[in-house]
Amino acid sequence: MDHNHPFEFRLKTARNYESEGKNLHALQLYLRLIDDYPESPEAFYSVAELYEKAGNIDSAVSLLKSFLNNDPENKDVRLFLGQYLLRNSRWEEAIEFLEYLMPEEEPVAVFFLGYSYFMLKDYERARVSLLNFINIEKQTELLHEAHIYLAKIEIQLKRYEAALSYAQKANVIYSNFWELNLIFAITYYNLGMFAHAVMSAEKAIRLNPQEPSPYEWAGKIYYKLGDYEKAETSFLKYIELIEDAGADIYTSLAQACLKVKKTKDALAYFNVALKLDPENKSAIEGIQNASDILSGTVPDIQ
């Protein structure tokens, strides 16, 4: 160990190199610090972040794991690694390291656990983790974000009254967040409260007009309300914004077109839906109905 250059001075020098964009020089200094001070996590964090910038995630994870192998009780490094894995969409590994932490000691770890389970679509475990988090942490900026994820989870579990309850709690802070308004729209739609649903969908669109998903739900809601022209417009906007619209959305668009007597358009959209999904029964029936209308076999749908 070089006692003429104490840790803090050498760490500051490395960070200065990094701030100047001299990442290779900084990396070399950080790695020397790790060799000389393997018990100090600061250089480990900095190397992991430099590796992340270079896309070298595996090396960063291995480095942080090596620290924990020597100091498995270090909660700060474990939490850092959990967040690092989370940030890089490595959900299973994040869970492995975050589960080690006691919720009462590191409540935020339970939030990250819930988020990881949510991303893995393990909704029951996600729900348990997030409920645990909000029971422990009564005063935190993450509380209302946890409510948003709980609302999403309850939608996936088809428990719409519970979803509405969590959405209303999140609304205290996030009333102008487009996604929360979309959550309200989806929840109200599934509860049959279409007048409420349409207001939420329209607000979500106003807040984020370039986000596709509110247009899809607006289309569904307008269709239920019998406003077929707005349903058609919404579905078309959704298709415009998304690269790979599925068969269901083309089927819904075609059905809206039938309602406003755009039978040729409807037939074209039904054919697109069938091409995307050859087993789509609604598209098959729709093609037959549209063809019959165009041939005069049956009257236009009212």
Mark where each language-model region is:
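Alpha-helical segment of the N-proximal tetratricopeptide repeat
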Residues: 6-36, 46-53, 87, 115, ...
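Register position in tetratricopeptide repeats
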Residues: 19-20, 53-54, 87-88, 119, ...
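Helix-start (N-cap) detector for alpha-helical repeat units in TPR-like alpha-solenoids
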Residues: 7, 41-42, 75-76, 106-110, ...
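Canonical tetratricopeptide repeat
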Residues: 12, 46, 80, 112-115, ...
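Structural marker of alpha-solenoid helical repeat scaffolds
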Residues: 36, 70-71, 101-104, 136-139, ...
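Canonical positions in the second alpha-helix
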Residues: 32-33, 66-67, 100-101, 132-136, ...
